[in-house]
Amino acid sequence: MIQNPAYQQMVLDTFCTALEDASPAVRAKAAEALGKIGDISIAPILVKTLKDTSPEVRRSAIQALGQLKDEASIPHLLAAGQDSDNFVRQSVAEALGNIGSKVAISALLKLVEDSNYDVRKSAADALGKIGSEVAISALLKLLEDSNSAVRWSAADALGKIGSEAAIPTLLKLLEYPDAEIRQVSAISLGKLGNEDIIPVLIHLLEDSNAQVRESAVDALGNVAQYRVA
């Protein structure tokens, strides 16, 4: 970290100048660098950059705002959630998850219905980080998504939120052909700590996939911890 205030200002001024560079790559790198500084007072500069003509630059500015965890920038990020670029919308979901404010939930609930699966996945991840039960209904719906990565993130998010309303659907996913889905479902069930799932987890030790069996053992360990507590 730069200790000399004069040098700090010099570097900041340089980055701000670079945000006006003719090259989108340079502007994007400048936005990224501003996020690394970690000073929340820089957020207004990055908010202005959300209107850059280059999607690459907008993505970098969004990611930087997520790093700063600036709640004041949330309204601007919500607006960016309507961007025409898939990667920009994905970055919005990730940034909102990093900030972790429940104010962002309404926007994330819209993003889980996005036409792009990467956006839906990132929105599910973000909802898991925020951990509000308001998201449960939408996440349960995502367990039926056509994309396996989205289903994985939805199951993982439900485990983080810790609602037993997810148990019936998670149990169904233990029979899913995709081993990764069976694995994350077992992990999520273990996080819920309901002892009634113990027989199911024991049966899962007969799964053909070693990682699924490993996750079943891990989940059983988590349930056992709940019982001891």
Segments from the language model and where they lie:
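Eukaryotic acidic, serine/proline-rich intrinsically disordered low-complexity regions
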Residues: 1-8, 25
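Amphipathic alpha-helical scaffolding segments comprising HEAT/armadillo-like alpha-solenoid repeats
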Residues: 5-18, 39-51, 70-82, 101-113, ...
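Core register positions within helices of long alpha-helical scaffolds
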Residues: 2, 33-36, 64, 95-98, ...
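Short inter-helical turns and helix N-cap capping residues of alpha-solenoid HEAT/ARM repeat scaffolds
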Residues: 22-23, 53-54, 84-85, 115-116, ...
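A generic tandem-repeat structural signature
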Residues: 54-98, 114-125
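Eukaryotic tandem repeat interaction scaffolds
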Residues: 121-125, 148-159, 170-173, 179-187
